[in-house]
């Protein structure tokens, strides 16, 4: 069984990932949704030829790490290995105006608070605030938060959570920079490969590394329909819209090992990269955060330990318009 706080750094061949590509999103990127099947097949064959030409030249990369975790309100509390400081996990991103490792105030957290499940020994931890729906997905349903799918610290038993990132060699795009058509083809294929890498990694995590679903036997189509146990919400997607959360992911994973660098807004370079969390709870499900109000914005900024106006920039598209 994969050990908690162990990292898995993976490199994949392009041919390993082709079965995991979700071509529906590729067609959507090309404006072919609803178009004749022949049009889709034509561009797919061009894409497969390009992928074949990459086989011996390029790869994709992934990092997965399993942590002990507990929820505290709408926050996730990640317990860090004792060697974190030497490994650079406790570095902050203050140069970007974001401080990630925190006991709530932007400083590395250590605690012996027995009442919330953090043991008497001084353990390092990282507080990872989540956002909660202010309007349910459907009438009668609860307002969801990803922290709902993690065992509360107050129960005295720790849960587990996975953290991951994937990327595609960024040099691919440069090769086609002088041809608009093939540049777009390379970019859309790279985006699909980053997602396909996450799909394949998630399968390996469920069945082997984390191993909470060792007997899973799903087709690729079933995986694309998300019929597996658990979820892998990605940063920047509907339930995790705050791209500055990538600074927290970086502190947990050291994303440069997968060739990923962050801009000052938390966007990943190369563009064809994915990062996020993996939950194993059988009832965990994907949801859209929707719009949040000024009250939650201010509370979230406080929990992140950053100025409200800075956080407003990251969550602009998720705010209720006045």
Report each predicted region and the residues it spans:
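Long, intrinsically disordered low-complexity tandem-repeat segments
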Residues: 87-111
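C-terminal accessory domains/tails appended to large, multi-domain proteins
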Residues: 115-116, 141-322
């Amino acid at each position: 069984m994969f050990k908690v706080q162990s990292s898995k750094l993976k490199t994949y061949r392009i041919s390993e990932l082709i079965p995991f590509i979700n071509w529906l999103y590729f067609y959507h990127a090309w404006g072919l949704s609803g178009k004749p099947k022949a049009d889709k097949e034509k561009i797919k064959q061009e894409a497969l030829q390009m992928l074949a030409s990459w086989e011996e030249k390029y790869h994709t990369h992934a990092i997965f790490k399993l942590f002990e975790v507990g929820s505290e309100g709408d926050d996730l509390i990640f317990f860090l290995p004792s060697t974190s400081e030497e490994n650079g996990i406790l570095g902050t991103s203050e140069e970007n105006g974001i401080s990630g490792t925190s006991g709530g105030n932007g400083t590395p957290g250590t605690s012996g608070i027995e009442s919330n499940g953090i043991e008497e020994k001084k353990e390092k931890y990282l507080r990872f605030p989540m956002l909660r729906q202010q309007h349910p997905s459907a009438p009668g349903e609860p307002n969801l938060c990803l922290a709902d799918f993690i065992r509360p610290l107050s129960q005295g038993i720790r849960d587990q959570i996975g953290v991951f990132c994937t990327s595609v060699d960024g040099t691919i795009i440069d090769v086609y920079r002088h041809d608009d058509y093939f540049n777009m083809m390379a970019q859309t294929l790279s985006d699909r490969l980053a997602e396909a890498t996450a799909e394949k990694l998630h399968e390996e995590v469920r069945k082997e590394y984390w191993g909470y679903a060792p007997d899973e036997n799903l087709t690729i189509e079933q995986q694309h329909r998300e019929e597996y146990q658990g979820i892998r919400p990605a940063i920047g997607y509907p339930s995790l819209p705050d791209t500055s959360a990538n600074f927290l992911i970086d502190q947990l994973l050291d994303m440069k090992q997968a060739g990923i660098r962050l801009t000052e807004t938390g966007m990943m370079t190369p563009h064809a990269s994915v990062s996020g969390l993996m939950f194993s709870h059988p009832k965990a499900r994907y949801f859209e955060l929707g719009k949040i109000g000024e009250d939650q914005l201010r509370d979230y900024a406080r929990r992140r330990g950053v100025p409200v106006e800075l956080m407003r920039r990251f969550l602009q598209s998720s705010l209720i318009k006045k």
